[in-house]
Amino acid sequence: MAINLTGRSLLTLLEYTPEEISFLLDLSAQVKRESRARIVHKRFAGKTLAMIFEKRSTRTRMAFETAFAEEGGHPIFLSIQDIQLGAKESIEDTARVLGRMVDAIMFRGYKQETVETLAKYSGVPVYNGLTDVYHPTQVLADLMTTQEVFGKLKGIKLVFMGDGRNNMANSLMIGCAKMGMHYVVCSPAELRPDENLMQTCLTIAKETDSKIEVIDDPEKAVDGADVIYTDVWASMGEESKQQERERLLRPYQVNEVLMRKTGKKDTIFLHCLPAVKGQEVTFDVIEGKQSRVWDEAENRKHTIKALMIATLL
């Protein structure tokens, strides 16, 4: 069956089928091959992308901006200081105005409700570049990187070490459930995943032959892991909780000893970045031969370009 994503938003991967995600990953691989071969297109010529940032960004901004501009489009950066979003003008009205002026909107900020409202009222594709609860474009890059290394996603065991409630843990759970992977959240009891999301993903897992577990013992969790993934201990906006998180998460640091506990020589390490080396991951691991974080970072651009090609053309 032909896949047509024209006009679609990406708010979470819950709204995408496994077949649609596979389509995006295949298109991402094609985009990457074209990029490496210096094949130039102008697929976004005459189109404009509004990029709204409440939170700072390196990879997300660079990926969206360069991907759109390379294809002949006009990306516009809008910080929260530049526009009236939710201040003197409602989010609904901002969405209506932008929808009359641009072809797509990217939002990176705090509340998931904001990106959902933009999608509801703008009438154009809206992309979630990160909220407090989800980071779907990052997971597309994670899945692409994993597939590049292992040649498949089905049955691959991915272990997330750290804060089981954060946006990466949530989004990876969805992505792994959709793609038939074995997903383990390894976190202390205080930072376990949201129960409602767990139940949603467990329901998906029954249909895709996925497996989802929550384990608090790091050594038990990583046994047989193909991918070990971690994120900063205190996410953006949670800096005041840094000391508490260090106390809770120090036993969940990804180091060389833990990497060896997988029992596999080809286990890879992933991190959405930025990383605090020496906290959630040691220097030796992130800079070591098992690390694929720089491929993963590059793949942000290819997956985001593929997403925009699929939804805008």
Swiss-Prot record:
Protein residues bound to carbamoyl phosphate: S57, T58, R59, T60, Q84, R108, H135, P136, T137, Q138, C272, L273, R300
Keywords (A to Z) from UniProt: Amino-acid biosynthesis, Arginine biosynthesis, Cytoplasm, Transferase
Entry EC no(s): 2.1.3.3
Top-level division of the source organism's lineage: Bacteria
A Pfam entry, by short name: OTCace
Record localization: Cytoplasm
Enzyme class: transferase
InterPro entries given in the database record: Asp/Orn_carbamoyltranf_P-bd, Asp/Orn_carbamoylTrfase, Asp/Orn_carbamoylTrfase_sf, Asp_carbamoyltransf_Asp/Orn-bd, Orn/put_carbamltrans, OTCase_ArgI
GO terms classed as biological process: arginine biosynthetic process via ornithine; citrulline biosynthetic process; L-arginine biosynthetic process
Pathway it works in: Amino-acid biosynthesis; L-arginine biosynthesis; L-arginine from L-ornithine and carbamoyl phosphate: step 1/3
NCBIfam families, sorted: orni_carb_tr (TIGR00658), PRK00779.1 (NF001986)
Family according to the record: Belongs to the aspartate/ornithine carbamoyltransferase superfamily. OTCase family.
PANTHER family assigned to the protein according to its UniProt record, in alphabetical order: ORNITHINE CARBAMOYLTRANSFERASE, ORNITHINE CARBAMOYLTRANSFERASE, MITOCHONDRIAL
This protein's name: Ornithine carbamoyltransferase
Gene this chain is encoded by: argF
